[in-house]
Amino acid sequence: MSDMNLRQRVWVTLMVSLVGLGGVLYGYDIGVISGAMGLINHYFVQAGHPLSHLQQGLIYGAVLAGGLLGTLLAGPCADRFGRKPTIMLACVNFMLGIGLIMLASSFVTLLLARLVLGVAVGIVAVAVPLYVAEIVSAEKRGMYVAFFQLFLTSGILLAYVVDLGLISGGHWRLMFALVLIPTVVLFFGMLYLPESPRWLWQHGFVDRARQVLLMTHTPQMTAAAIKEIDQQSHIDLGSW
């Protein structure tokens, strides 16, 4: 990376930081429920429909169930439509899930919202590290992919801080709603980021793939990356 010029360094930093918001969304969704659950139960008690322990457990676990579905969908979706649209799809799911929480006045609606958020989390867990791994140089790949865990942990911490600040006012819906800020930033930010060069190459957009690589690689690194992508493409074809 020492041979990269300033513009390439800026592009790498921008791409990894922006896409890393997916990790923040992931972590926030994991952490926010810990502070919100007591307020949610209080809301339903006041409405005359207190949640049973089973229902509370289902609300906690719905994200895991949705996450399983999301991870199963993410791979085929990323291969067929691209890494970039798949990340944007996760953002749409986050928006939909939060929208349902804003409207939730029943256990079923709240459970559905958590399932939708879980699907978003599962997609992010696959698509974001995949995109980062394919956009940066091989020599720095491990370091940048590991940043996803840093962003995820930051998201959990952020959720705890938000919970601490809002719990006294009983604003459990706002606890969830605040994640819309990084979600919207990620969604619209992805419009300006390029598609993964590996996906472009594998789908016949060779010139565009080379252009994207040159945004974040030196010419020598680009040649090595193209060779790696081409070899992997032949291996993938051979496996079928």
Feature map (PLM): residue ranges:
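Transmembrane-helix signature of 12-pass secondary carriers
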Residues: M1-W240
